[in-house]
Amino acid sequence: MAAKKEFDIFTHELVPEHRILSEEEKEELLRKYRIKISQLPQIKASDPAVVALGAKPGDVLEIKRKSPTAGYYYYYRLVVED
């Protein structure tokens, strides 16, 4: 039986940079935008990027995307169970 090959999803040119926010950063984000955690857009725990990062439900991801006009912009996703 052949060994399963691993693919680093973050090396693909179309996959933006992801990182897990610390608890302090998460609280600051919620305070800055005056929102509750339930108001964040969601991303499923089975998403390949979430699995690759090892994020758990309840974690908040910061995603850095390229923009033709702004250079880069950040958006945030709450990891939820499937």
Curated annotation (Swiss-Prot):
Source organism of this protein record: Thermococcus onnurineus (strain NA1)
Enzymatic class: transferase
Main location: cytoplasm
EC number, as in UniProt: 2.7.7.6
Compartments (UniProt record): Cytoplasm
Task performed by this protein: DNA-dependent RNA polymerase (RNAP) catalyzes the transcription of DNA into RNA using the four ribonucleoside triphosphates as substrates.
Keyword Magnesium (UniProt): no
UniProt keyword annotations, A-Z: Cytoplasm, DNA-directed RNA polymerase, Nucleotidyltransferase, Transcription, Transferase
GO BP terms in the entry: transcription by RNA polymerase II; transcription elongation by RNA polymerase I; tRNA transcription by RNA polymerase III
Protein name: DNA-directed RNA polymerase subunit Rpo5
Segments passing through the bilayer: none
Family as reported in the entry's similarity comment: Belongs to the archaeal Rpo5/eukaryotic RPB5 RNA polymerase subunit family.
Pfam families from the UniProt entry: RNA_pol_Rpb5_C
Record text on subunit structure and interactions: Part of the RNA polymerase complex.
Lineage per the UniProt record: Archaea, Methanobacteriati, Methanobacteriota, Thermococci, Thermococcales
Catalysis: reaction(s): RNA(n) + a ribonucleoside 5'-triphosphate = RNA(n+1) + diphosphate
Single GO MF annotation: DNA-directed RNA polymerase activity
GO cellular component, one term: cytoplasm
